[in-house]
Curated annotation (Swiss-Prot):
Its main location: membrane. Residues 32-42 have a biased composition (Basic and acidic residues). It comes from the Eukaryota. This is Autophagy-related protein 9. Phosphorylated by ATG1. ATG1 phosphorylation is required for preautophagosome elongation. Keywords: Autophagy, Cytoplasmic vesicle, Endoplasmic reticulum, Golgi apparatus, Lipid transport, Membrane, Transmembrane, Transmembrane helix, Transport. The gene is ATG9. Pfam families: ATG9. Residues 32-127, 715-736 are annotated as: Disordered.
Amino acid sequence: MTDKSTFLSVLFGGGSVYQDLDGDGEVEDAEILRRVEEEHAQTSDNSNSDNDSGNDSDVPTSLMVEGVQDPKPGSKRRQPHRMATLSNLQSSAGPGARSVSFAQGTKTQTPIRLTKPTGVANGGLPRHKQDLGASIRTMVDPKELALWKWANVQNLDNFFAEAYMYYTGKGLVSIILSRVLNMSTIMFVVVFSTYLGSCIDYSKIKGSRTLDEVHVKQCYAKLGSFHVFVLWTFFVLWFMKLFQYVKDIRRLVDMKSFYQELLEIDENELQTISWPQVAKRMATLSEANAATQVGNSTKQRIEPHDIANRVMRKENYLVAMFHKRVLNMTVPLPQPLQRIFGRPQLLSRALEWNLSLCILDYVFNPAGQVRPMFLKSTHKQILSTGLRRRFVFAAIMNVVFAPFIILYLALLYFFRYFNEYHKNPASIGTRRYNPLAEWKLREYNELPHQFERRLTLSYIPASKYLDQFPKEKTALVSKFVSFIAGSFAAVLGIASLIDPELFLMFEISANRTVLFYIGVFGSILAVSRSLIPEETLVFDPEISLRYVAEFTHYLPPEWEGKLHTEQVKNEFSLMYEMRLIILLKELASIFLAPFILYYSLTQSCDDIVDFIRDHSVHVDGLGYVCTFAMFDFKQKSPDHQPDEDQKMLKSYLYFMDHYGDKPTNVSQTQQNVPMYSSVRLKNDGLDLNNSIMQKFQKHNGHHALSGLTQRDVGLSPAAPTATTATSGTATGAAPRRDLINFDVDESFIDQTTSNRDMDNDEQPKDKERVVDMLNQFYKKTDNMNLGA
């Protein structure tokens, strides 16, 4: 078996996620001939007995090899080195045969039979010594080759991560183009900044009229030794990254073949197709080719939930740790400064990278699985000490590289955003969610592109919510400033139109012409006008914030009854900050990161180790994953802290809104459950009036646009106050455990586990499942709507 697998690896090559395919796929002719001879000798010895008995137990059905006899005398001689392709999916394979075709929707399957090169006779050697690998790869059917590689994937985490990266990158050409432009951007920033700093004599600019007069001859030869060392280090790293990208092209080509041949998604369709549809096609592919399942796992089907768990395995732990406040991201300030600024928390992209390096790379092994040591309480002290050392080492490295990082980021942000702010000064006041807020708002198993889309939908209503609050003092000052600046700009502009040659070069102050002041007053006018609220804006912050929560799914219980107050507005503003403030925090975090790593995060080491151990659950076919990501509602948290804002429930409902097709194995009584797929909009669009999340919010009294209460929609006045998908537990009310009639013995993980153990023709056991709960929930909401 090993020799056959190695032989196929030599022929077809592959990426790092394929078994024995880590090489470049090119070997010497002698090595190929030796392997062909050994492989054929092993199969020819027992060919008669195997053919008579039909016993192929020594070869799996996914890699069965047929012997090829020498041509009989008088028969037409075959061309040497032509290889019969992988046998097509045949209808004569029996009742269990299945193949997959997404266009027609048929499902049949047969074992994949790989035939030998027809140029190999019983003697064992090819008739001509040629590079068989290259010739066979060009002649084998691309679809069957892609299916063979899919059957030999060894690390599904890496494979699905690469598949998702390929999807978000929008195909082979777009990914390569993006990488080329990114590498060019980095090179441009370094080379251009070096030229501006070393090749221009700024003392000569005032009396010069051409670039040659201020250009320093042979400027690069005059660079200091430290500057030269930094440039050489950069170029070495740059070319190493370039080599990595070039080497990665082969895996991208394999992934393109997987999408195009097996999922039947070409480059054009990839630009518009939604990820849930891609995930469902992957699930259909794995189900139709169960005989070629990877790793001989007992898991017979890959579901969209499994794919999301594999892609988000590491990120789910970070989402949970931020949600449970395990990570201490407080900026360590002296006591006098703490009295003024309090204890602010800071998270930047640089700190995110440090967290990934220190925590995730420590918890997970290279295969993407949780290290067994983290699952045993006896190793807590050792692991905590090791994690603390990683934080300290990261703090030291941040101090060493801080000058270079701050210089690069400053130049990058300057080149990227200067033109934007120059063309549109009002954009300086635009807002975005800061990184810490993003991790608070992110949900379990929510892929990055889905999360970004949800936040993007909330930008406009969030800005309108903040703009509603009275800013009379700011508005009065802004109107006065805009009037003064507009007056100066109007006079200078009209004068320039009357006599352009005179006024454009006319100096109002020393070395400051009319053109300079027109730009200054124009920028002041644009910024001041952006601070004046619209006169047609209706003031209703409570309804506006509830509408924002339709997208963010965030409305803490302590905000209840205070949505109109300045306190809630200020707390929301700390999450939804101005872009300029976020950029300044990114630059400041380069200097503050060492202190946060050394003083704050080192205090969280014990909690991090305990959290990983207590919130990891083993799932057959997946390995250890975060308990919250499995939507196991019956499992109580080891820390016994109630999930006040119900993040796991919201994550489950939002997941169903995206992937909402019913499980394949459901009883006939569950077929009429209205799921999200029946109201799917184009490209992952969400119908807020028909989604599961919206019905859940209405059931709990949060009608964002109408402001209706539970009594308005027909709920019993005696019913206890319910928690909402966006607010958690109402103030003074106990959380409801029966939001959608959850049984304490039922959970999503029970449903998925039982489905994996059933055959396709077997109906599930007659017991209550999550779909039954949703069915009852929809009946209630429909009755309430009819009653209203």
